[in-house]
Amino acid sequence: MSLATETTDLVGPFRSPHNTAAEAKGSIHDDATATKLGFKGGTVAGSLHMDQFVPQLVEIYGGEWWRKGNLSLYFRQATVHGEAVRTFARRGSPHARLWMENEAGDLIMEGTASCSGSDPDSELTHRLKGQATADPGALRILAKNKVGDEAKDVALKVTRAGLEQRLKTVPEAMPEYSGDQPFLPPSMQVALFRAAQENIIKLSGRAVGLFGAIELQSINGPPRAETDYAGRFKILALSESPKTENIWYQAWAADPKTGEDVASMVMYLRFMKASSDLWN
């Protein structure tokens, strides 16, 4: 059943995103691996769905959203290649409420957006406060990590070729994604940080991971393609559930010349215990 109740809700069109990582064997995006772990098929990365919200955010906040905007989403249900979904946005203060539904009205993700700098009550800030710390010895996949671990001076960059590859399947094309200094859509902002993730997360053995939630914050944005950034990372929390081991980390991208932060990301990753030999 849809959550849309107000005539002022902004409703996007149904889009059917591509599972662009379907050929990544052994990942959650691979049909064989995903179905073995109980999913209905290889999953579409939640970061790809984030691009669908951009037209509504620009309608609510104008072009300033690219410079100071926040997008914070918690992923409720995975989708598969070609599954139709649409976005909803409800204006509000201090932030707008966002969610995504499939054609059956199932909730795919929910969260917040704002345009006044860091949001102290964003979706992920709220959820991070409720995280119970894993007991000592409870983690196996993530046993080598600890809260407060950091990585600094990490080179970050998205090439124009990488951006152009994404734009072949982006669900909502925006003029800002082209030109001499193209903006990065949310999915490619995530890719900017994720490409260097091994600098902060140390896995014991192999395990299949999936996105649990992502928050993007433009500080002096937007981040752009073909631009060098200096990255730093910090682990915020470690937790576990009967099925997963979980890690929260934050990453920042700064101008290497001035040291001024351009953008940041908070990432919540879940690693499936059933995918690890350490749990079987």
Language-model regions: role of each:
Residues 70-75, 213-220, 235:
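Short structured motifs
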Residues 1-15, 80-145, 220-280:
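HotDog/MaoC-like acyl-thioester-processing domains
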Residues 70, 95, 211-213, 248:
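Short coil/loop residues immediately preceding or within conserved phosphate-binding loops
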Residues 2-68, 120-215, 276-280:
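Hot-dog-fold acyl-thioester-processing enzymes
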Residues 42, 72, 78-80, 222:
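Residue-level "contact hotspot" at macromolecular interaction interfaces
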